[in-house]
């Protein structure tokens, strides 16, 4: 077998020839050591990599130039290449300027001017619209406002397309379909209610689609059968009107909807990329897209803003409510919402009339338009109105906590209505979000089926838009009212009542100090940055808080279960938990046997009816009902309310009290914002609970292990403190002081005044600058500082390497900062006076040397960059004119320099 000893190419498995010699360009050995240059180049083009995928060694090529190439390029060649590069740059600059002008100037400006023209309400504005388009008055403000208008129209367009997809794939409501509902596998109509009523209480929570937003708390069980009966009655009425032609039209319509995204649409989407659509590929096709975007903006402004606004405006004027709407400071928004409400009523009336006269295509079009308006209004109510109500109710119930009155809130609303409403909406959204998060935590602890009246947000079938499409409007209205009652009652229980108790028991504890000014000697900026950079990351980035809360909920549930004999109801039985896997398998098999796959005409309604026809609700576990079960449930609710009240009292008093006591050592008797005291108290409480939980976890391991762990943790804490002093103390202080000397002092302090430096402010700003520099470094290219920071992050606190951090990170950074601070000072204070200059010149040099040296460093960096760019241009010109090929460089093991030979010039690599 002589061929086994011959050198062959790793790709084509051929031997080397004088015309095609073999090379060994990387560290690989054995049968994959050698390769032809042509094979390697072909493989590199295919893989789009410049290194060996096995040994990670970068391949090197040496350029081959023409024999008549001079040692130095002639001036005329360099000048010609420079002119060509400048011409290419100018052409690209003109093109990208045109692109930016079109998308950032023409599109938003036309949108804003058309919007103002339509809402001016005069014919003269419509006639002068072409001249207004060319006007340069308020150009920047109109562009910014136009960007907002364009964003709204694009969001509306995307929402319409997405809503259409929801209707196509999820199925339209039953009342919108033309034909009679198809039969399911059991032989019943799709809209018939199930015969069995067992477990209706638990099934109803999983019954139709999940509630539309996070505020619908109360389930819809009592009216499930009524709703199905109403839908059945509607469908039976529609059956009398629909014929064979209608069924064919419905099937064809559904088929047309499914064929809307055909292959040609996919092919067109593949050809249209973002670069081509925006004009970043160098073509002028984007001008057509600009025209279509402007037309789309005009159409959407006219249809979705102009028409509803004027419908609402004429209606309010006719009813005499115009003055009340104007007094709300949100005339445009309220008028538009009223217009949409009237439009929805008009559409549903026209839909009914079209049904009576059997205009089936018009009937379907009117129904789809009604669904669009209905979903839009429900989204506004769920995401806008409900959090706003919660935010205002929270504010009203907490007025005594801040020593405020309703008159103060009215004055703040009159002075800044938009800001006030946004802040209250934001507070309400936070409240709703944390309430939903707490419900998710409860589901992890309690028995499946306990919270049957609450939505399961983790349900994979959860789709609020489908609920908005399918459920009638009165059910959404009822859910909204019940949710407002439930959320409002919780606010009364956990905020208003604890405040009343605190004021009666601790009269001097309230109100909280929330003034925007402070007479404390410590800078507000320092406290804010300390809060944002130290306290909040520790409280938010740790997963221990959720585990502690989950443990408290589990302990409370176990206690309440044994006290009230509701352990089986709350947590389930152990025997049932052991057999839960078998039950789940049986339930899944039962579900597969009963659930019919919905066809095109059925959609989501059939899926919901399939869920209803199961033997029990999804995820339900049976439980044992003790005697006097309703009374025990009532006592459980009372016990829960008392627990929530006590927990709220502790949360409102303990952190603030601890924070005030600790901050008094720092600020004395001066009053500061309660945000800082509460944050400080929460941080101390968190540290205390964390230490207690760690000690409790160590207790079962014995005294020797505890001493060993205490020793390890003490050593780790000492190392961490040293690193914190260097990296979180010295480095930010030097960085903030350097920023003060280079930027702040020359800009803010005149030459005839002496700048004052505040170490706390400099340190706080330095912390912010250090985090920004670290983030930019980690996002940038690979260099020694990024490598060191990544290594420190990878080690973490438990494996902290003090020697590595001091030697590789702290010492170099501190040395550079000290040199940046000391060298200019030595020059200004030690060298300049020896030159015999005047005192004014010495003061000028002393105050301006830091920004001057910064400018020198920046100019040197720019000059170095330009030199590198000129070298690249020189190589590019030389390669374009004299390069005839490239030769692969062999890897030499014995020579480190050859083994790590640098890659060829970028312009010559292929």
Swiss-Prot record:
Q: Which InterPro entries does the annotation name?
A: MARCHF6-like_C (IPR056521), Znf_RING-CH (IPR011016), Znf_RING/FYVE/PHD (IPR013083)
PTM comment for this protein? Auto-ubiquitinated, which results in proteasomal degradation. Deubiquitinated by USP19; protecting MARCHF6 from p97-mediated proteasomal degradation.
Residues that, per the record, bind Zn(2+) 1? 9, 12, 36, 39
Which residues does the annotated region (Disordered) include?
Answer: 185-256
Enumerate the SMART domains for this protein.
RINGv
Tell me, what is an example of a GO biological process annotation in this record?
protein ubiquitination
One term under GO cellular component: endoplasmic reticulum membrane
Q: What is the effect of changing residue 885 to A?
A: Does not restore the degradation of PLIN2 in MARCHF6-knockout cells
One GO MF annotation is: ubiquitin-specific protease binding
Question: Keyword set for this entry?
Answer: Acetylation, Endoplasmic reticulum, Epilepsy, Membrane, Metal-binding, Transferase, Transmembrane, Transmembrane helix, Ubl conjugation, Ubl conjugation pathway, Zinc, Zinc-finger
Q: What is its main location?
A: endoplasmic reticulum
Chain positions with N-acetylmethionine modification: 1
Q: Which residues lie on this side of the membrane: Cytoplasmic?
A: 1-91, 164-283, 358-376, 443-480, 541-632, 700-721, 786-815, 870-910
Q: What is the effect of changing residue 9 to A?
A: Abolished auto-ubiquitination. Loss of ubiquitin ligase activity
Localisation per UniProt entry: Endoplasmic reticulum membrane
Q: How does it sit in the membrane?
A: Multi-pass membrane protein
Task: Establish whether keyword Endoplasmic reticulum is in the entry.
Answer: yes
Q: Which disease is it linked to?
A: Epilepsy, familial adult myoclonic, 3: A form of familial myoclonic epilepsy, a neurologic disorder characterized by cortical hand tremors, myoclonic jerks and occasional generalized or focal seizures with a non-progressive or very slowly progressive disease course. Usually, myoclonic tremor is the presenting symptom, characterized by tremulous finger movements and myoclonic jerks of the limbs increased by action and posture. In a minority of patients, seizures are the presenting symptom. Some patients exhibit mild cognitive impairment. FAME3 inheritance is autosomal dominant.
Self-association and partners = Interacts with DIO2. Interacts with SQLE.
Official protein name in the record:
E3 ubiquitin-protein ligase MARCHF6
């Amino acid at each position: 077998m002589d061929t086994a000893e011959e050198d062959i190419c790793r790709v084509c498995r051929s031997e080397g020839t004088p015309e095609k010699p073999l090379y060994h360009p990387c560290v690989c050995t054995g049968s994959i050591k050698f390769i032809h240059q042509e094979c390697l180049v072909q493989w590199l083009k295919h893989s789009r990599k410049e290194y060996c995928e096995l040994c990670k060694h970068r391949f090197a090529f040496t350029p081959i130039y023409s024999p008549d190439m001079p040692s130095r390029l002639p001036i005329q060649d360099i000048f010609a290449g420079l002119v060509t590069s400048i011409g290419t740059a100018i052409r690209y600059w003109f093109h990208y300027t045109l692109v930016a002008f079109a998308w950032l100037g023409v599109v938003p400006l036309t949108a804003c001017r058309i919007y103002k023209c339509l809402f001016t309400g005069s014919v003269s504005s419509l006639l002068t619209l072409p001249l207004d388009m060319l006007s340069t008055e308020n150009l920047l403000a109109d562009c910014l406002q136009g960007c907002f208008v364009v964003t709204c129209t694009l969001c509306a367009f995307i929402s319409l397309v997405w809503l259409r997809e929801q209707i196509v794939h999820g199925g339209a409501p039953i009342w919108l379909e033309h034909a009679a509902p198809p039969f399911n596998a059991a032989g019943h109509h799709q809209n018939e209610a199930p015969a069995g009523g067992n477990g209706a209480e638990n099934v109803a929570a999983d019954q139709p689609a999940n509630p539309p937003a996070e505020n619908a708390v109360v389930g819809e069980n009592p009216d499930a059968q009524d709703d199905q009966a109403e839908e059945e009655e509607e469908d039976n009425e529609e059956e009398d009107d629909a014929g064979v032609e209608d069924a064919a039209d419905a099937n064809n319509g559904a088929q047309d909807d499914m064929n809307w995204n055909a292959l040609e649409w996919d092919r067109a989407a593949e050809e249209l990329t973002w670069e081509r659509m925006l004009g970043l590929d160098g073509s002028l096709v984007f001008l057509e897209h600009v025209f279509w975007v402007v037309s789309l903006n005009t159409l959407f402004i006219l249809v979705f803003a102009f028409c509803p606004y004027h419908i609402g405006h004429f209606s309010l004027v006719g009813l005499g409510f115009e003055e009340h709407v104007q007094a709300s400071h949100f005339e445009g928004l309220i008028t538009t919402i009223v217009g949409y409400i009237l439009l929805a009523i008009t559409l549903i009336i026209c839909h009914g009339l079209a049904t009576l006269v059997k205009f089936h295509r018009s009937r379907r079009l009117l129904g789809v338009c009604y669904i669009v308006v209905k979903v839009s209004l429900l989204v506004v109510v769920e995401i806008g109105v409900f959090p706003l109500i919660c935010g205002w109710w929270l504010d009203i119930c907490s007025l005594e906590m801040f020593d405020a009155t309703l008159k103060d809130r009215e004055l703040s609303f009159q002075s800044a209505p938009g800001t006030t409403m946004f802040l209250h909406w934001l507070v309400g959204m936070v409240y709703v979000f944390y309430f939903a998060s707490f419900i998710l935590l409860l589901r992890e602890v309690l028995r499946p089926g306990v919270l049957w009246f609450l939505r399961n947000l983790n349900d994979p079938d959860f789709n609020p838009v489908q609920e908005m499409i399918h459920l009638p409007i009165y059910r959404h209205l009822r859910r909204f009212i019940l949710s407002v009652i439930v959320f409002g009652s919780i606010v009364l229980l956990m905020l208003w009542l604890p405040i009343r108790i605190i004021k009666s028991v601790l009269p001097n504890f309230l109100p909280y100090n929330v003034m925007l000014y402070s007479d404390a000697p410590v800078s507000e900026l320092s406290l804010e940055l300390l809060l944002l950079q130290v306290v909040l990351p520790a409280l938010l980035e740790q997963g221990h808080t959720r585990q502690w809360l989950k443990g408290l909920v589990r302990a409370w549930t176990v206690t309440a279960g044994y006290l009230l004999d509701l352990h089986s109801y709350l947590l389930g039985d152990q025997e049932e938990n052991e057999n839960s896997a078998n039950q789940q398998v049986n339930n899944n098999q039962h579900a597969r046997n009963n659930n019919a796959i919905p066809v095109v005409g059925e959609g989501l309604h059939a899926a919901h009816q399939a869920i209803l026809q199961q033997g029990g609700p999804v995820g339900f576990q049976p439980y044992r009902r003790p005697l006097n079960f309703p009374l025990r449930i009532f006592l459980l609710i009372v016990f829960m309310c008392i627990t929530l009240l006590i927990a709220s009292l502790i949360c409102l008093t303990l952190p603030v009290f601890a924070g005030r006591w600790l901050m008094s050592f720092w600020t004395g008797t001066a009053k500061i914002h309660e945000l800082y005291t509460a944050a400080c108290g929460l941080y101390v409480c968190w540290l205390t609970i964390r230490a207690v939980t760690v000690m409790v976890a160590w207790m079962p391991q014995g005294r020797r292990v505890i001493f060993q762990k205490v020793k390890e943790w003490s050593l780790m804490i000492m190392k961490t403190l040293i690193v914190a002093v260097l990296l979180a103390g010295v480095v930010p202080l030097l960085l903030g002081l350097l920023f003060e000397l280079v930027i702040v002092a020359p800009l803010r302090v005149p030459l005839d005044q002496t700048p004052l430096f505040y170490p706390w402010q400099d340190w706080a700003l330095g912390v912010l600058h250090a985090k920004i520099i670290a983030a930019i470094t980690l996002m940038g290219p690979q260099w020694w500082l990024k490598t060191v920071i990544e290594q420190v992050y990878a080690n973490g606190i438990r494996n902290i390497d003090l020697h590595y951090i001091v030697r590789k990170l702290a010492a170099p950074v501190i040395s550079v900062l000290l040199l940046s601070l000391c060298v200019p000072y030595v020059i200004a204070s030690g060298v300049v006076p020896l030159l015999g200059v005047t005192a004014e010149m010495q003061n000028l040099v002393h105050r301006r040397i830091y920004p001057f040296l910064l400018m020198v460093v920046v100019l040197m960096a720019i000059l170095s960059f330009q030199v590198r760019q000129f070298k690249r241009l020189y190589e590019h010109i030389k390669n374009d004119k004299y390069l005839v090929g490239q030769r692969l460089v062999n890897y030499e093991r014995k020579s480190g320099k050859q083994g790590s030979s640098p890659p060829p010039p970028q312009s010559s690599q292929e």
